[in-house]
Amino acid sequence: SVRLVGSEMCIRDRSNNLVQFHSDIRSDKIEILKKNPNASMLFYDKDEKIQVRLKVNCVINHKNEITKTSWDKTQHISRKCYLVDKGPGTVSDVPTSGLKPELDNFDYTKEQSEEGYKNFTVIQCKIKSIEWLYLAAKGHRRARFDLENSKDSWLVP
């Protein structure tokens, strides 16, 4: 795990088993993934009682065609978090959004939002395996789908 708690991710390229998400290049997770691109992602649906764990290998994209394509599809209102002066997780003496006062509301243009591109990254995660766990009072069920070796297995929960 790379402390990706709360991040929403979308499967962007099903034929190649890729999950991708956006991050700030200054985020701690970037340095962690540079040192070790292997990560795990855990998803849980309380209503369905299903837990899914992905084991992935991550590639960090920054200032390349992949980031440019994703950036161009991002609404300018969503680009706001990449305009902060200091990186995510930087300690502050006061409550702050991290934005310059003139950007601390929604009154900025798409052109002004372009400044955030320098901090924008796309992390593409190649799924190596999927573990599925169904939690049931009558007995749990668990399976592993190994995408690297095309091998599926039932597991004891």
Can you annotate each of these PLM segments?
Residues 51-157:
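Charged, gly/pro-rich active-site loop segments
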Residues 1-6, 11:
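Single conserved hydrophobic/aromatic residue that forms the stacking wall/gate
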Residues 6, 38, 127:
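ATP/adenylate-binding site constellation spanning eukaryotic-like Ser/Thr protein kinases
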Residues 4-6, 16, 119:
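A structure-centric signal for secondary-structure junctions around beta-strands
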Residues 1-2, 23, 54, 73:
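A general, composition-driven signal for non-globular sequence regions
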Residues 12-49:
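A short mixed-secondary-structure module that forms the rim of ligand-binding clefts
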